[in-house]
Amino acid sequence: MGKGGNYVMVAASEVEELRQKNGEMEKAVEEMRKEMLQLWRRTQVAEEAEEHLCSQLAELEAESLDQARDYHTRIIFLTNQLSRFSSDSASP
């Protein structure tokens, strides 16, 4: 490369090489953008699935709590009945 004043003289082969590298880099950047977009979409799907699962889990937790309360009420009822029957059979 020779210098002419404030300008740098670049050979035509170097210009072509730089253009080729620039084109390759632009393709690489575009490919990275596509990959990033795909990853972003997959992340969105995963986040939506997580929200759905959390919602289902909350519903199941509420349902299990209701069932536990029902079972507890039933156990108390049966315990009271058993106690009453035991005391009735023990009485003359």
From Swiss-Prot:
Keyword Nucleus listed: no
GO biological process entries: cellular oxidant detoxification; regulation of flower development; regulation of short-day photoperiodism, flowering
Coiled-coil annotated residue ranges, if any: 8-63
InterPro entries: LSU
Disrupted gene: phenotype observed: Defects in flower and inflorescence development in short-day conditions and delayed flowering.
Induction cue: Accumulates in response to phosphorus, nitrogen, potassium, or iron deficiency.
Assigned keywords, A-Z: Coiled coil
Superkingdom, natural source: Eukaryota
Function: Required for flower development in short-day conditions.
This protein's name: Protein RESPONSE TO LOW SULFUR 4
Organism: Arabidopsis thaliana (Mouse-ear cress)
Gene name, Swiss-Prot/TrEMBL: LSU4
